Swiss-Prot record:
Keyword Signal on entry: no
Lineage: Bacteria, Pseudomonadati, Pseudomonadota, Alphaproteobacteria, Hyphomicrobiales
Function: One of the primary rRNA binding proteins, it binds directly near the 3'-end of the 23S rRNA, where it nucleates assembly of the 50S subunit.
Gene Ontology terms for molecular function: rRNA binding; structural constituent of ribosome
Modification after translation, per record: Methylated by PrmB.
Pfam families, per database record: Ribosomal_L3 (PF00297)
Primary gene name: rplC
GO CC annotation: cytosolic large ribosomal subunit
Protein source organism: Methylobacterium radiotolerans (strain ATCC 27329 / DSM 1819 / JCM 2831 / NBRC 15690 / NCIMB 10815 / 0-1)
Complexes and interactors: Part of the 50S ribosomal subunit. Forms a cluster with proteins L14 and L19.
Region (Disordered): 140-162, 217-241
Name used for this protein in its record: Large ribosomal subunit protein uL3
Residues bearing the modification N5-methylglutamine: Q151
Amino acid sequence: MRSGVIAQKVGMTRVFTDAGEHVPVTVLKIDQCQVVAHRTVEKNGYVALQVGVGKAKVKNVSAAERGRFAVAKVEPKKKLAEFRVTEDALIPVGAEITADHFIPGQFVDVTGTTTGKGFAGGIKRWNFGGLRATHGVSISHRSIGSTGGRQDPGKTFKNKKMPGHLGVERVTTQNLRVVRTDPERGLILVEGAVPGVAGGWIQIRDAVKRKLPADVPLPGKFRENGASAPATEAPAAEETA
């Protein structure tokens, strides 16, 4: 079981296959996704990798967190996440996982926070049918109707579907196909929609319900800490500094 990565949702576009068919894809960008720490059975009781992505302002990082980043010899990260892995899939601390960690054609599971919709009624939130348009119904066409019995049971049961806040929930979309990767720009293109808004953080991992292709890199595709980046990445890094 390999590590996943943290990416940022850029938006949606489409790509064309050799047969001329267009495929809708979501563009995900990896921005210096580095391994920050290891979790081991001896010390933590399980095996995992802690990875971080993005650059955080030092003033927004606590002293304890700054110390952990200093031990790992990485810059303070804006977003952290843990991924359970097997012993043979541990990546060295400080290594930067690149976009070609995933290969075209393989399936991945993506996790993100859905777009917030605010307070929503039963029709929008739960796909209720609403009441009749005529025959005595007035004003309450989009109401949810009865929420419980009268004397028996004489209450509304817990978890009854009712109006309320919609969105801002952690959702995992499974079995999305990787269409293309661009290691030089840190881009991963996956087929279909990904939960969340543009700019939101997305976790990408190998699909748990699909067989892993035999040619995926193990433990993963990464650059050692301090290794030189490809020449095409150097100007972009200077511009963002």
